[in-house]
């Protein structure tokens, strides 16, 4: 069953760190079966507070999503994201 990783950027803290994250994150997808469904496109807030951006990634299942997120390559890149902005992120299982 497909699983989706969703990241919502609430607030940018350090644009330089986000640039480093963007430069480093692509290598983390190598060897993982991932499909980008949304990548910082236009957002219309329907409920709650507005966000700056969102990413939605599709993986074959929860285990594959976790394997990518926990990979050393992603965790190394994510350090820049953690310093660069406030995000919320989660994995949700599809139907």
Enumerate the predicted regions with their spans:
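Short S/T/G/P-rich N-terminal loop/turn motif that feeds into the first structured element of a domain
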Residues: 1-53, 60-66, 70, 93-95
